[in-house]
Every structure is written in structure tokens, then in C-alpha cells.
């Protein structure tokens, strides 16, 4: 899936993200392309199922993981028509900084972006939304 790396590169180009990924969530349920060396590279099918699953409440209470990194769900509009995004924040383990994460849902793929320290979640949400809309409009 080397062609998908250009989408990740596009998400990274403005310098506000430390990581980005394109992840299949239908039949090809795995990471299609991701920033090298990041946590998104390690996202598992079980983690994908948690994000796109029918239970839209459990992760507010229990959190979720992305590439084994513990996270809290801030806002879930993944299945809201016209939005199709989710806002997440990493949890601090051992005093390291926390980061905003946004997920955008297209027809067959999820777009993940993680901001650098201090990057506001609203801009990340717009970035994930825009790429997911472009991919959805392109048949993905």
C-alpha cells in the first residue's frame, strides 16, 4: 500500500502533527500507511474494532488504546452525518506530555492525526475531517 504514504506525508507537511496514519476498518483492517516509528504504526485490529464498533459509550468510561498507548475519548461524532470525526487525547504515563488526536472516517478507511505538544485539537479535527471527506468523495 505504498501509494497511501503520500496521504500521510500530506497530513504531516504543515508541521503541526507528529504522526499521521491511514487505517483500513472494513475488510482490510490494518494500518495502510503511517509515520515511521510512531504509535499509529502499531494500531491493531482489536483497537480498530473498538473505535468503529457499535458500543459508542464504553470508551468514554474505560478509554481506549492506539498502538498500545492509553487514550481518553473527548468527543465522538464518528457516526454523525456531516461530521464523521472523533477527538481523543493520549494519557500521560510516567509524566510525559499528552497529545491531541483526531480521527476522521471515510467509507473504508480512518484518518488518524496526532498533534505536537501544544497543538489544539480543533485544528487536528479539521485536518482529519478534510482528508476523510476527500477520501470518502474519492470512493474510499
UniProtKB/Swiss-Prot annotation:
The modification N-acetylalanine is found at residue 2. It comes from the Eukaryota. GO terms for molecular function: actin binding; actin monomer binding; ATP hydrolysis activity; phosphatidylinositol-4,5-bisphosphate binding. PANTHER family: PROFILIN, PROFILIN-2. Binds to actin and affects the structure of the cytoskeleton. At high concentrations, profilin prevents the polymerization of actin, whereas it enhances it at low concentrations. By binding to PIP2, it inhibits the formation of IP3 and DG. Belongs to the profilin family. Keywords: Acetylation, Actin-binding, Cytoplasm, Cytoskeleton. Highly expressed in brain, skeletal muscle and kidney and less strongly in heart, placenta, lung and liver. GO terms for cellular component: cytoplasm; cytoskeleton; extracellular exosome; glutamatergic synapse; postsynapse; presynapse; Schaffer collateral - CA1 synapse. Transmembrane segments: none annotated. It comes from Homo sapiens. This is Profilin-2. One of its GO terms (biological process) is positive regulation of actin filament bundle assembly. Gene3D superfamilies: Dynein light chain 2a, cytoplasmic (3.30.450.30). The gene is PFN2. Pfam families: Profilin. It is found in: Cytoplasm, Cytoskeleton. Occurs in many kinds of cells as a complex with monomeric actin in a 1:1 ratio. Interacts with PFN2. InterPro entries: PFN (IPR048278), PFN_euk (IPR005455), PFN_sf (IPR036140), Profilin1/2/3_vertebrate (IPR005454), Profilin_CS (IPR027310).
